[in-house]
Amino acid sequence: MTQFTLADRLATLPPYLFAQIDKVKAEVAARGVDIISLGIGDPDMPTPDFVIEALKKAAEKPANHQYPSYTGMLAFRQEVANWYKRRYAVELDPKTEVLTLIGSKEGIAHFPTAFVNPGDLVLVCPPCYPVYAIASRFMGGVVQELPLLEENDFLPDLDAVDEATWEKARCIFVNYPNNPTAAMAPRSFFEKLIGIARKHNVIVVHDAAYTEMYYNENNRPLSIMEIPGAMDVAIEFNSLSKPYNMTGWRIAMAVGNASLVAGLGKVKENMDSGAFQAVQEAAIVALRDGDAFLAEIRDIYRKRRDTVIAALNKIGITCRVPEASLYVWARVPEGYTSSDFVTRVLQETGVVMTPGNGFGAAGEGYFRISLTVNDERLEEAVSRIASL
């Protein structure tokens, strides 16, 4: 069989982080080891019944099995606008400032196609979701890193970026609550970022996939669209995947500056055929009726977080107590690199975790635990780690 070479843009990519982890996990499982996966952030709990029932009803409508609108059902976009108004007190025009996505990863990956030309400077903040940099490089963008350091509360040091860089920058990707560090950004950070972006005409791309996964009602994560002036320069990606246990459904939204939303929409109308309408109808129900469910989910994850933090502290592993996200971000024990520690834990105990350096060099010295198994399995996982 002929072996064809990859395009240069693919040939230079490092292996995708989670694909590498899956390979080692399969090798360990083949030895008969009981695997506890704390790697990928994929909720273990089912989609709520009321959303599934809504999908069943929507799937019975013949019209929903035809091609959907490229921009998404207006009814879904209206419900997104309603939810933003209720949750963040943000006014959105559902016709021009909301776009339906086939999952937020799809929208984030397509965004540079619309707005990044070869040679454009793109700022990313590692440790972070690898797609920001990969998608930008695919379009010929030049990626510059603003590292997230623990001593700066895992916020990029905006003051360390000189005026010339801001003038040259096309866009900056930020993500709060943050994956993988679980950090939250205060209003003052967003205000400063939006001020800089407006001054230098920089696009702010905010990945807000974890805003509903918080543990303190008195410190709820912000939407960047709450910040005065954000509508001038920002687009925000949000998703139903994590809060509603709908990762496999692939339904999300982009909101914000109308020209940014329209540009992304133009890419999508040429690259995909929209989200299944029955899923959009079910998502309407989730956004409209899901507040009580979300409160229950937050309680479950809060207990899991506390279980992991207590167990890690007991064996001498230190970490901050996260106030949001599905993750615990902890330092590796002295004498290990991130990859060495995570690989040893997986090979000797069957516990899957994510090495911090998989999110960029700034993540070296850390590992990430996903809170996506029940308390009993979490305790068992940390017990196995302690046995090393």
Curated annotation (Swiss-Prot):
It catalyses: (2S,6S)-2,6-diaminopimelate + 2-oxoglutarate = (S)-2,3,4,5-tetrahydrodipicolinate + L-glutamate + H2O + H(+). This is LL-diaminopimelate aminotransferase. NCBIfam families: DapC_direct, PRK09276.1. Substrate binds at residues 16, 41, 105, 129, 179, 368. Pathway: Amino-acid biosynthesis; L-lysine biosynthesis via DAP pathway; LL-2,6-diaminopimelate from (S)-tetrahydrodipicolinate (aminotransferase route): step 1/1. It holds the Pfam family Aminotran_1_2. The keyword Transferase applies. Transmembrane segments: none annotated. Its cofactor is pyridoxal 5'-phosphate. PROSITE patterns: AA_TRANSFER_CLASS_1 (PS00105). Keywords: Aminotransferase, Pyridoxal phosphate, Transferase. GO terms for biological process: lysine biosynthetic process via diaminopimelate. Its EC number is 2.6.1.83. It comes from Oleidesulfovibrio alaskensis (strain ATCC BAA-1058 / DSM 17464 / G20). Involved in the synthesis of meso-diaminopimelate (m-DAP or DL-DAP), required for both lysine and peptidoglycan biosynthesis. Catalyzes the direct conversion of tetrahydrodipicolinate to LL-diaminopimelate. The lineage of its organism: Bacteria, Pseudomonadati, Thermodesulfobacteriota, Desulfovibrionia, Desulfovibrionales. Pyridoxal 5'-phosphate binds at residues 70, 104-105, 129, 179, 210, 239-241, 250. It comes from the Bacteria. Homodimer.
